[in-house]
Amino acid sequence: MKMTLIAILTCAAVLVLHTTAAEELEAESQLMEVGMPDTELEAVDEERLFECSVSCEIEKEGNKDCKKKKCKGGWKCKFNMCVKV
């Protein structure tokens, strides 16, 4: 009975992971099909850099250590800037 339950839960977890990965690939392919002009992509990059550096500066003003803002969508905060992972 326990083995059956473990097998069902394992299959469910694998199914969820594959579904999530498939949705990400579909979203990427739709973005590539529609396409964004380079200027729009540059604006998005600049916004991410600005958001990350401003959040650190605001936190430093309160005499606290800078806790870097988490960047989303495959970006991470490094040296007060969001960089692509």
Curated annotation (Swiss-Prot):
Its keywords, alphabetically, are:
Disulfide bond, Neurotoxin, Postsynaptic neurotoxin, Secreted, Signal, Toxin
Q: Which residues form the signal peptide?
A: 1-22
- Which cysteine pairs are covalently linked by disulfides here? C52-C66, C56-C77, C71-C82
Places the protein is found? Secreted
- Domain of life where this protein originates: Eukaryota
Mark which residues the record calls propeptide: 23-48
Which GO molecular function annotation, any one, does this entry have?
Answer: toxin activity
Q: What Pfam families does the record point to? A: Toxin_20 (PF08089)
Q: Give a Gene Ontology cellular component term annotated to this protein.
A: host cell postsynaptic membrane
Tissue specificity, in the record's words, reads: Expressed by the venom gland.
Q: List, alphabetically, the InterPro entries matched.
A: Hwtx-2-like
Described by its record, this protein's role is as follows: Neurotoxin active on both insects and mammals.
Describe the protein's quaternary organization and the partners it interacts with.
Answer: Monomer.
- Family named by the database record: Belongs to the neurotoxin 12 (Hwtx-2) family. 02 (Hwtx-2) subfamily.
Q: What is the name of the protein in this document? A: U4-theraphotoxin-Hhn1a
